[in-house]
Amino acid sequence: MENLKKMAGIKAAEFVTDGMVVGLGTGSTAYYFVEEIGRRIKEEGLQIIAVTTSSVTSQQAEGLGIPLKSIDEVDLVDVTVDGADEVDPNFNGIKGGGGALLMEKVVATPTKSYIWVVDESKLVEKLGAFKLPVEVVQYGAEQVFRRFERAGYKPAFRQKDGQRFVTDMKNFIIDLDLGVIENPIEFARELDHIVGIVEHGLFNQMVDKVIVAGKAGVQVLEANK
């Protein structure tokens, strides 16, 4: 599995050229993309500026000597490469398993070419088997949680080291065990209107390419947007 992730990450780096502003994703597959960008800077003299989607990725990039700016210091991002937890045939996806969904979506929004790197196990017919992360402000988080309980969404506060997980933006994450999301577009709209929710892990019709590594090799799927 790790080898498949590495293959996808290295393939994605082929879409990066000199002079670009590059969004560096978060997670186990995006990790290999960041490593490859670091190698190209060191060995090939690749010249880019990068923005990151989490404190973890920032630390990785700094260790590799990748020059960084904040998202507010750039107007547009040429290409962002990130992982995904599930991708359906309509190129809707669930992200946020690593807890960085808000920053990931902030960086994805001004990106010209948004690419996901996944192994073939992440391709699904319908979203929802992977728990959907919902980032909520700490104030009133129990109110949102109880609302989800009443709706039958089987919510659970994400935990880390025996305490509630806190995101880089100092929010909580509630994971929803939905099983199947029949209409991701409609469900995203519902979540967007709930006060206290900062962001959710449904990334619908945002991605331009999905790089999939499998037993047969690496393929690049083009989204029909």
Swiss-Prot record:
Pathway(s) it belongs to: Carbohydrate degradation; pentose phosphate pathway; D-ribose 5-phosphate from D-ribulose 5-phosphate (non-oxidative stage): step 1/1
A Pfam family it matches: Rib_5-P_isom_A
Binding residues for substrate: 26-29, 82-85, 95-98, 122
Gene3D superfamilies: 3.30.70.260, 3.40.50.1360
Active-site residues from the entry: 104
Assigned keywords, A-Z: Isomerase
Reaction(s) this enzyme catalyzes, per UniProt: aldehydo-D-ribose 5-phosphate = D-ribulose 5-phosphate
GO BP annotations listed: pentose-phosphate shunt, non-oxidative branch
Gene Ontology molecular function: any one: ribose-5-phosphate isomerase activity
Enzyme Commission number(s) of this protein: 5.3.1.6
Keyword Isomerase set for record: yes
Subunit structure: Homodimer.
Function: Catalyzes the reversible conversion of ribose-5-phosphate to ribulose 5-phosphate.
Family named by the database record: Belongs to the ribose 5-phosphate isomerase family.
PANTHER family: RIBOSE-5-PHOSPHATE ISOMERASE 3, CHLOROPLASTIC-RELATED
Protein name: Ribose-5-phosphate isomerase A
Source organism: Streptococcus gordonii (strain Challis / ATCC 35105 / BCRC 15272 / CH1 / DL1 / V288)
Gene from which this protein is expressed: rpiA
